[in-house]
Every structure is written in structure tokens, then in C-alpha cells.
A protein has these predicted regions:
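Short histidine-centered beta-strand/loop micro-motifs
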Residues: 27-29, 35-39, 56, 62-64, ...
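Ligand-binding loop in jelly-roll beta-barrel domains
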Residues: 74-95
């Protein structure tokens, strides 16, 4: 798969999707703010820089993820994410 650029939420979330070791992956930047994403496949989000707070659909509490930490989202689900105190960079692996 050739790298593919994606833009969401009026340009506030930018990503580049590619295949790594046979697995679909994307890297990107989330501008400060709050956003909701739906999932088809299960995903693992790793915070590369900055901080993301996340809340998976069906849960009550926001969990803080600083750089170097990850969280997983089930397939056919969704999650809220917010970049706090500036933009955040991430790597998303589709499981």
C-alpha cells in the first residue's frame, strides 16, 4: 500500500496510513481539542509525543496517556480522544 494522507475534523487531525510488516498502520498529529472516532478493526493507539486523554465507548472515565503509553480499542466500537496542553502525535496499529 502506498502511503495515504488523511485529514479529519476540518484539518485538526492529520494522518498518513501505510503498511508495516503486513499490518495497516497510521501515524499522525491531533490538534489540541476533543474528537470522536469509530473503529471497524481493533486498534492500538500509542502516544508518540504530547498527551492524549481517551475514553472508549461504553466506559465512564477518561484515562490519561502520556508519551510512550498505549491503549486499545475494540473492533466495531469507538472512542473519544482529547489532546491536552497542545498537539499530540500518535501511531495507530490496526490489530
Amino acid at each position: 500500500m502506498a502511503p495515504q494522507h488523511n485529514s479529519y475534523f476540518e484539518g485538526n487531525v492529520q494522518s498518513v496510513a501505510f503498511t508495516r510488516n503486513g499490518r495497516k498502520t497510521s501515524v499522525g498529529v491531533i490538534a489540541e481539542g476533543q474528537y470522536h472516532f469509530g473503529t471497524e478493526a481493533a486498534e492500538r493507539m500509542t502516544v508518540v509525543s504530547g498527551r492524549l486523554d481517551a475514553k472508549v465507548d461504553g466506559t465512564e472515565d477518561w484515562i490519561v496517556y502520556p508519551a510512550g503509553t498505549s491503549f486499545e480499542i475494540p473492533a466495531k466500537s469507538g472512542f473519544d480522544v482529547r489532546a491536552v496542553n497542545g498537539d499530540a502525535a500518535y501511531c495507530c496499529e490496526y490489530l
